[in-house]
Amino acid sequence: GLEDKVEFVKGDSVEFMKNTEEKYDLVFLDGNHDYDVVMREVPEALNILNPNGMILLHDYFPECKPLWPNSSNVVCTGPYIGVQQLQQQGLKFFVEPCGNMPWETKYPNEHATSLAVGVRYE
């Protein structure tokens, strides 16, 4: 198993990341997706990443558009807008939406996912 390699944290992500001394290869952000939280979460997550580490963002909707047919109400704007704003402010953070997965995702016969991978660059 991966019990000794994976740590799930339930709680205030920003506070956890501010207070941990650990470094991680992967940080999965899937909590409060509000813009103001994302604006604090992403920089804190970058601070606790190992070199070449990655951030996995959930509910990242490029251009704030729905990913699935008939799901116009299912768009969470905070992660996308927050990342765009951080990049405009000079944060060197590249994000690539995962797009389609080889398996069905949220809706039957759909392979689109709202996951995106982010990395720091120099």
Regions found by a protein language model. Name each.
Residues 1-122:
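S-adenosylmethionine/decaboxylated-SAM
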